[in-house]
Amino acid sequence: MKKLLKSVLAFAVLGSASSLHALPVGNPAEPSLMIDGILWEGFGGDPCDPCTTWCDAISLRLGYYGDFVFDRVLKTDVNKQFEMGAAPTGDADLTTAPTPASRENPAYGKHMQDAEMFTNAAYMALNIWDRFDVFCTLGATSGYLKGNSAAFNLVGLFGRDETAVAADDIPNVSLSQAVVELYTDTAFAWSVGARAALWECGCATLGASFQYAQSKPKVEELNVLCNAAEFTINKPKGYVGQEFPLNIKAGTVSATDTKDASIDYHEWQASLALSYRLNMFTPYIGVKWSRASFDADTIRIAQPKLETSILKMTTWNPTISGSGIDVDTKITDTLQIVSLQLNKMKSRKSCGLAIGTTIVDADKYAVTVETRLIDERAAHVNAQFRF
């Protein structure tokens, strides 16, 4: 049985090292791997001994925590209906503002194409009886999101038979043949958790852990890659809780009542893992259940535009049917009042697999490397020492 367990764990770790598939699982035996300290010797007494004190039971570990998510599996978390202008019908231009209508939400259940997050932090763990860890991380994180424009409710007004947009005009077309991507700045991030070695038999250890993480980075850059309305915004601002129509000055430098776009990230995770110590190597394999959410308050961001036209244009949006600006300088053939919203996103899969190994030196220092897959493709590195 021991040989079989060794073979399974070693094969899992070595087989996953060639490819990397928010929160790491960690080695279940970590609370009991470093039993000696660089300043104080470890204590191996009996917890039931009446002469034992809490000073003997508690130890401290410090180190580096790096977590690199290359692709988190996310989907939008929105309502099935979306309020905007009624869809155009026929070939006639619109002589009046579009009628508000409740339409099928193109963002409902949309999967994100790419979601990345990179965290570097300090790691601190309080150990009790070489069996339990209470730990936290303090550091910084940055992220990247990319998805189809439908997932961001990219909309605009088309076919309006007027020379300028009116205050009561609302979008009537949804753009789904485009891509939206955003980069966040580097923001403060923290996490807390607990880990326990629940069962030990020889060199095998079964353990469990629970963690919670939070961060709120601001959107540093927003790119909309669309033939009908392509634009980039640095440090975008938008409207929270604002229904259509947006303010007529939305997207201009004089727009008011806007706020910075930021993403509130929360995640919790519970895991169960099994490890087996092989001299200085301790490979492990574990399963995890997690839920992550990315909430930007459904902020709506308007395409940048000029307050007054220059060369009969307020944006660089091209003509759609090729007719260009007619003699009356009407806006019929160009996309107007373009905007998008940052919808709430959540985990598309709750269960994942983690495979890793820990290298221990002199019972005082340890380095853990881990890969995760199924619900995300990620890598984790943790280096620490015991006082």
UniProtKB/Swiss-Prot annotation:
Keywords: Cell outer membrane, Cell shape, Disulfide bond, Ion transport, Membrane, Porin, Signal, Transmembrane, Transmembrane beta strand, Transport. This is Major outer membrane porin. InterPro entries: Major_OMP_Chlamydia. One of its GO terms (biological process) is monoatomic ion transport. GO terms for cellular component: cell outer membrane; pore complex. It is a multi-pass membrane protein. Belongs to the chlamydial porin (CP) (TC 1.B.2) family. It comes from Chlamydia muridarum (strain MoPn / Nigg). Coiled coil: none annotated. It is found in: Cell outer membrane. Part of a disulfide cross-linked outer membrane complex (COMC) composed of the major outer membrane porin (MOMP), the small cysteine-rich protein (OmcA) and the large cysteine-rich periplasmic protein (OmcB). The lineage of its organism: Bacteria, Pseudomonadati, Chlamydiota, Chlamydiia, Chlamydiales. Residues 1-22 form the signal peptide. GO terms for molecular function: porin activity; structural molecule activity. In elementary bodies (EBs, the infectious stage, which is able to survive outside the host cell) provides the structural integrity of the outer envelope through disulfide cross-links with the small cysteine-rich protein and the large cysteine-rich periplasmic protein. It has been described in publications as the Sarkosyl-insoluble COMC (Chlamydia outer membrane complex), and serves as the functional equivalent of peptidoglycan. Permits diffusion of specific solutes through the outer membrane.
